[in-house]
Amino acid sequence: MLTIVPLGGMAGCAEDSASEEGPAEGEGSGGEVEPACGPEVPCALGDTCTEGVCGRGPIHDLLPELPAGQVAEERAEALVAEGMADLPGGRFAVGRPGDLVLRNDRVAFVIQRPHRDGSLTPYGGNVIDAVRLGGGDAGGGDVDELGEVMPVLHIGLTVDFESVRVLNDGSDGGPAAVVAVGRDAIWDTVDLGSLLGRFDLLRFDLNADLPLLVAAVYSLEPGSGTLRASFTLLNEGEEPLETSLGLVVDPRGAVDDFVPGRGHGAVGFDEIFASLPPAPYLAFHGARISYGLLPLHFTSEGAHPPAEGSAVLNLQGITAAVLGKPDILRAVSEPNVTIPAGEAATFGYDLLADATDAADVHEWWLRSTGEESIGMVRGTLTGAAAGAPEGARVAVLDEAGRSVTAAQVVDGGFEVALAAGSYQLRPATRSQGLGESTAVTVEGGGATEDVDLQLPEPAGLAYAVRTRSLGGEERSAACRLSLIGAVPPELELRAAFDPRKDPLPPGHVAVHYSRTCDSADDGPLRVRPGRYLAVISRGPRHSAVQEIVDLEPGETTTIRATLHEVVDTGGYVAMDCHIHTIGSPDSKIEIEAKLLAYLAEDVDFLVSTDHDVLTDLGPAAASMGAEGELSTTVGVESTTFAHGHYIGFPLPIAPDIPTRGAPDWAGGRGPSLTANQLFAALRDLGAEVVQLAHPAGFSGFFARSALTFDLEAGAFGFDTAARTPNEELRLGPGEPFFSDAFDTLEIATGAGGAGPGGRFFGGASDEPGMNDVMRHWFDFLSVGMPAVGVGCSDSHGLVERAPGYARTYLPALGGGGPARPDLGALSATGAAGARHGDVIVTNGPWLSVRGPGGAAPGALVTPDEDGSLEIEVTVEVPTWLAPPDQLEVFANNTYTLPASTPAERAMEPVHEEPLEYEEVPAGDGGVVLRATTIVTLATTQDEDAWVVVRAIGGEPLFPLMPASIEIDLAAETPERFITATEGRPPFAVANPLFVDTNGDGAWVAPLLAGAPSSPF
């Protein structure tokens, strides 16, 4: 642990300033500003009022000194942005007028004005843009692929900077500098207590109010690509303060985390208990730009990296580093600094913003830390006669096989600076894995080693596949190509790439989406030679091509075929209402790539639901020429850590706000919003649909509500003893938590129905993953809560949690253009002309449920005079998929909640029967599997009823969905080539028919009399 003493004074002057409202007015770009002050006009935080004039307060005398100005042509400047022209560009640039800019001829950084929003990094005063200025990119424009960098104190606190202003404008030839002053504040948009607290790991009070005054200084020297940030913490209390110092990075763009000794990829919860080396620095490695972050301690002798390195953890897509700790367990349980009363400690970071690759960052780190024995390795990489493959990298490993760094291959060449020593170099591409290892010995003193590396000769797979509609029209359409076979262990790519960002399913060598399903347009697939099963598909409404291919080195094999539309869902739109793109911190998938996947999986309507930011998919769809094939709307997933995730759509974009108009579920500087308050906030923003996202699980809506259902009383209640108090969830005391003001709930999240990963979500291990949510849903229906069941993917990648599975079918609106759904079918109150609740949830099979007179789900139906109710059920799947083999019908089923025993979990449908299929011609040359049955239910006039139909199977939906597989390379047919087990079985669920048993024209929930009077 480090005890840090007061530091020297700060050179420079306080100049232009910014407020939360916008730019300062009436202040020049040079000379010290001395605003008037008095009892009614206080000075900025950190300043003092002397004889009616504001001046620098004591904390300014504790800040690190800036280097003296230099006489040189190069200059750096600091300014308050008065308009957008003062701000750097880049696709992830979020700076707005009123923010402060530091820039030179290489880079620009934006420091946000005092601000508050609902992002993962909620307060202003931090770096929000790190930009390589134009000319360093093929397009010649500014490049920004980084989100925000924020200090973290006490593991769960940060700083609410109340004052941000220019400290030195750079006109003296020295560093341009900005100073921000604030106090510690709860990091309320990330509640680590709700995650780590359940494991009894934390030793810090995450709601503490520390006696700290904090001053940040951001400085940029002329000609440098590195920003230096320092955070000086003045202990204004009367006792020594033990705390923890750390940093958080939101690497929002197309960059992969890289940690020396571990390689690429986020360090997640599964690695907390692993013996991982601490990080000397962090790199964020991208194809267009890379960033380096070097944590720093400041003492009277200057700035230096922690000798012990830093413990690193990735959480919800953001990267946290705790200084001077070897691992996360010690980081969350031990302080790393003691600040005596009345004294200060300073820590910070250097941020490199114009690196080419991780190797560039590594060299920057070596030189920043004073390494004297540095040599250079230069080389070429070839991949057969065609030269180095696009996107290739060279991984550098030490003698023990640990990752040191990785270099991009540009125009067939690469270079990397290394400390003297022995290393292994391994070339790699994402499709071919790691190549053979080459040993090199690096001499110090600037010596250069030349090496030639070669990747194995790849094989090629070309394809030309057309799609034929039910009406016989043939055209080019998007498709998915999956290549399945024996995967060599060398495809573990962490040394060169992030293999866990969107990992391939078991046995898959490649998954490729094609806009036209023709390699003449996007090139053949290049992979390792071998024997594979190639599967070309276009979602569950079409046939598929399955062909065994023997791919030889240097040769290209071609598949030619036609995909047939075989399932007729006419009048219905396939919707995914829970998807993530690169706008979410835990997704790295470009919008265009995501849209291409949805085109290939044959989904018609998309709701963007990035975490706490609004993303408009429409412009990207238009640029791809896809606006006639799918339609989109804007939504949000409000991602509370403590009590669940909630979706609202459609929403308007607010372009002048960094979150683009997403609600601040953490409540600004007050208590966080309850579910009830958040639903209202989403409505106020314009949401027509409010949705519970994966509501089961240890911190989900159901659990946090402590919702119970008394089967004998037929009533919901709340287990107040089990419910976490509002104060522990950072909610307002006395505020009611539960609300029924939602429209939809995800009865199936993901292809398996259980939610993200299925680890803490969904049903018990002895039942289908969706059953837990369905039990709640059925109980809601029985007491008259109008909740529509939907299915969504919650897709963060292209392969894992695949786009479009589960999906929801709902009625289409009339008119021309791409299919759009009637969102009135999802509204709790319905809409004029809408078939309320005419909704099907599925991970593949098509399910049609029709009551008397052809009534669709959501309709009010009346039994025959003898009380019998006939329901016609049809299930269709293409022949390449395993169909559901069992039909279940539920009517007024109610369950004890929580269901903790097998008996309580028993679903007990009122009717079950096996489904029998026949092959039926479909469209022009296609074949579909179809099962049709008539279910007859006997009703009484004792109570009205709801009826839900579910089709469910036991065999995996492979190859549409991943599965555990066994491969027989000697087999001659696709059926024998792969045996799939333990995959995701098929399911489809129809929303309820409402049965008016006594024919009075009204429907009364069967247990309405037993429903609690409040808050329903």
Q: Residue ranges of each PLM-predicted region?
A:
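Ser/Thr-rich, Pro/Gly/Ala-heavy low-complexity intrinsically disordered linkers and tails
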Residues: 9-56
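Beta-strand-rich recognition/accessory modules
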Residues: 68-76, 81-83, 89-90, 94-96, ...
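Acidic, contiguous internal or C-terminal segments within carbohydrate-active enzymes
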Residues: 116, 120-133, 178-258
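C-terminal functional module detector
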Residues: 190, 468-486, 497, 508-517, ...
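A short, solvent-exposed beta-strand micro-motif common in secreted/extracellular proteins
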Residues: 323-324, 420-431, 510-515, 528-539
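A short, amphipathic beta-strand motif
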Residues: 375-385, 412, 453, 459-472, ...
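Short, ordered, surface-exposed loop/turn motifs in non-cytosolic proteins
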Residues: 376, 383-409, 468-508, 884
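A metal-dependent hydrolase metal-coordination microenvironment
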Residues: 544, 566-724, 747-750, 770-772, ...
